[in-house]
Amino acid sequence: KEQIKKLITIFPEGQVVIIVDDKIVGCALSIIVNYNMVKGDHTYAQVTGNETFNTHDPNGNILYGIEVFIHPDYRGLRLARRMYEYRKELCEKLNLKAIMFGGRIPNYHKYADKMRPKEYIEHVRNREIYDPVLTFQLSNDFHVRRVIRNYLPSDEESEHCATLLQWDNIYYQPPTDSYVDRKPTVRIGLVQWQM
């Protein structure tokens, strides 16, 4: 509860909650980070600053998904999809480059003795294997950038693996330097003749 309050304080528009009959039935939490922080291997603890969220950078260029949950009684109503649509709209509105997050692969433990994570992801992508998390993410236009090991050390179902997922904002406009900010490069060549 305290963590959600902090997120609402530092980045209110990044937090979305679905309430039905005065009961929270779903939420999506996110922060803004710089791409360099999350492009390679990282853990949930690192990206969240051990859940202090001091890693939130309003000047960053990535909307990073911290958590999404839907109460079991309300699954199948496309509520998670609506929250993801909100995140995409927010990403476009804030002119952020992409949405990224570490996604669990909870059915991987059933296949870990037969295939590596890369093969498992391919089977899920080809709809030969169903994974409740990854199948949903792929159907929402996210793509797998890489496998992250030990993203959530306690996630035994995923065999301590996660997928780094990304959705690219096709409307993203990189910031342009103003004329004042430019530092021109001047090259001077000198030749000295001895006579």
Where are these regions (language model features)?
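Short loop/turn motifs at secondary-structure junctions and domain boundaries
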Residues: K6-F11
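Conserved acetyl-CoA-binding loop-helix of GNAT-fold acetyltransferases
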Residues: I70, G76-E92, A98-F101
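Conserved beta-hairpin
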Residues: G14-A28, T43-Y44
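Conserved acyl-donor/pantetheine-binding loop and adjacent beta-alpha core of acyl/acetyltransferases
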Residues: A28-E67, R82-E85, R104-P132, L138, ...
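Glycine-rich phosphate/pyrophosphate-binding loop shared by adenosine-nucleotide-utilizing enzymes
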Residues: K23-C27, L63, V186
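C-terminal/domain-terminus segments
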Residues: K1, R82-L90, R146-T176
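Hydrophobic structural segments
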Residues: T176-M195
